[in-house]
Structures are given as C-alpha cells and as structure tokens.
C-alpha cells in the first residue's frame, strides 16, 4: 500500500526555472532552516543596537527558544489564537529595539499577520520572517529585515536552508556537515521505495530522520549547504510543485463534508499550501486511525519551552498532506476516511 505523508527524499527536476535566482547577492544558501535562524540572530547581535529581547509566536518549534537562549537572547512569546479563519496575535508589549519573528502559517494568506508586521516595523522593532511555510506562496511581506526558510521541509535535499537579507556573508563559512550528507545518502533511496510500495520498516526510517535532526541540532559550526543540493534547487520544478499542491488542497477542501473542521476553506490567489490545516477536538484519535491506514498527518509542534501564553492550536490542529507526490485519488483516499469518522 502506498504511504501518504512523511519527509521528502526526492527533488522533482526541470532543467530551468528553479525557485531562486542563484546569483542574487542578498540570497544565501545554508545547511538548514535552523542554521539560517542561528546566523540571523548572531548577525543581529553584532550589527544592531537591540534590547536582546526576541519575541516568538506561541505556536512555534522549540528549536527557536534553544538557539536564541544559547546566544543570550531573552525569549518572550506572543499569543496566537485561531478563530473564524484568522490568526490573531498580541504583540502589544513589544518595544522599540526588540526582535520579533513572524510566520504565515501553512502558506495561506493572513492579512492580520501582515498588518502586525507593518505595525511593529514602524514601532522600531527588527523583523524576522520565517517563510518556511509560505516559501512558494506570493503572500510574504515586504517589510521584514530578514527572511529565512527551510528548503528541506519542501523537497528531498540532504541539506538546505535559505536566508534573504543584506550583509549576511561575513557571518557564513563554506563548511558542510558531511556527516549529515552521508547519513541521508545512506537511506534516502530505500526510503523513497518505501513511500511508493509501503514495504519496509517505518520505525527504522523514523529513527534515521530523527538522527538527522540531532546531527543538525548538535552542529551549528558547519553552516553551508551541500553544493549538489544547491544545484538541485536551481533545477527544482517549482511550477509542478505549486500546481499539484493547489490542486490537491482544493480537492481536500471540496471533498471533506464537515467544513467546520477546515481552518481555511479556500486557496486564495497567491497561496501555495504547505499542508491543509484541520482543527479537531479529538485530533489524536483521528490521526491514529489515519496512521493505521498508511496516512501520516503532520502535527507541527509541541508547546515550546517556557511558553505560558495563550494558544489554542497545540492540542487540536494537524495538517493534511497535499504535496506533489500524491494524486487526486490519494486525496480522495484521505477524505473518504475522514468523512467516515468525523461527523
């Protein structure tokens, strides 16, 4: 049985029209999204007069706290509440000179978040925009001082993150984490076959990816992206990826009967879904049933260290896969199961 969901292990290739202008002087490829954030936070401390306060969204990965704390930042969280198709955030206490990190969740347009970016930029805050989930969307702000993303979350490179900002080059090096590269090389091909056939040990591949994450977390000294990965990204068939993700997300939206569980009920112009987010009171039982059918949903994050502010997503939100690896029939396989168990 074909597996739906899970990390990527292959890059769809076209000979031209990749996502990035490789020679853009403000574009820097690095080893991962985490390394990108690390470099940005280091550069801010050295290049700006700041308060050393970093505001993170209450719905975010724990890695952000760990990186910032190690660098001496005082990490504070701002509330993130999802209601009636919008994320509402509270940054009333952010002050001039503070550093604020934003992201557009799941690649869907969020006017309120864009308004907050503009407002806090005018307030005198330094703005970082994590564009990982909106990497292919046309809904990023024009007001951030720094942009970064994980490429690894979108396609099957061994290494891959990107920074878009001025003056970052002095903080980079050319050292590649070859331990990570060789580790991923050792199992990516077999994992790709597992996704197609369902034949293999899921626990083994999960442990391989977990080990890869530990390799990234334990080594921020080797900053560079593996050059063959840079070349692959230059040939990445982005048009195919965008088209398939939109098509698949629209199929999910159209065929899920209970529209109340959908956090977004349309794909707007310029949106390219990272996943299709769903909100359910009994999320864990639904995910467990989907998992038993070879459909692995994405629960993005657990509540990060020290986060006590309000957020209504950690226990109830999950993402349905809609990427280019899957067909309309695969999407209907997902919705058929959901429609059976969700009233």
Label each residue range with its predicted role:
Residues 1-21:
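S-adenosyl-L-methionine
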Residues 63-66, 109-111, 135-138, 155-159, ...:
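Short catalytic/ligand-binding loop motif for oxyanion handling, primarily in non-cytosolic enzymes
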Residues 19-23, 65-70, 92-95, 115-119, ...:
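Short loop/helix-cap segments at secondary-structure boundaries that form the rim of catalytic
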Residues 81-171:
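Active-site phosphate-binding strand-loop segment of PLP-dependent enzymes
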Residues 14-17, 24-28, 33, 60, ...:
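PLP-dependent aminotransferase class I/II
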Residues 41-94:
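Conserved PLP-anchoring active-site segment centered on the Schiff-base-forming lysine
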């Amino acid at each position: 049985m074909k597996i739906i969901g899970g990390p990527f292990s292959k890059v769809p290739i076209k000979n031209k029209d990749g996502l990035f202008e490789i020679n853009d002087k403000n574009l820097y490829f690095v080893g991962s999204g985490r390394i990108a954030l690390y470099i940005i936070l280091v550069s801010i401390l050295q290049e700006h007069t700041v308060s050393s306060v970093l505001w993170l969204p209450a719905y975010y990965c724990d890695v952000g706290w760990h990186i910032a704390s190690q660098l001496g930042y005082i990490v504070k969280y701002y509330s993130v509440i999802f209601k009636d198709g919008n994320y509402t955030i509270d940054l009333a206490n952010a002050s001039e000179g503070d550093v604020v990190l934003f992201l557009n969740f799941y690649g869907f347009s969020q006017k309120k978040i864009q308004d907050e970016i503009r407002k806090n930029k005018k307030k005198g805050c330094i703005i970082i925009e994590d564009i990982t989930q909106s990497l292919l969307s046309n809904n990023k702000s024009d007001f951030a001082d720094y942009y970064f993303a994980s490429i690894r979350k979108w396609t099957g490179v061994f290494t891959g993150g990107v920074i878009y900002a001025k003056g970052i080059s002095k903080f980079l090096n050319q050292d590649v984490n070859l331990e990570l590269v060789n580790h991923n090389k050792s199992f990516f091909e077999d994992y790709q076959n597992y996704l197609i056939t369902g034949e293999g040990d899921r626990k083994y591949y999960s442990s391989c990816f977990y080990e890869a994450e530990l390799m990234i977390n334990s080594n921020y000294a080797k900053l560079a992206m593996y050059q063959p990965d840079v070349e692959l990204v230059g040939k990445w068939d982005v048009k195919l990826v965008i088209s398939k993700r939109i098509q698949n997300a629209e199929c999910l939206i159209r065929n899920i009967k209970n529209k109340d569980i959908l956090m977004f009920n349309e794909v707007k112009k310029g949106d390219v879904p990272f996943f299709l987010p769903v909100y359910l009171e009994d999320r864990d039982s639904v995910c467990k049933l989907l998992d038993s059918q070879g459909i692995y949903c994405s629960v993005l994050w657990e509540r990060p260290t020290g986060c006590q502010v309000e957020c209504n997503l950690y226990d109830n939100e999950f993402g349905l896969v809609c990427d280019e690896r899957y067909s309309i029939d695969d999407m209907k396989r997902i919705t058929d199961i959901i429609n059976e168990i969700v009233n």
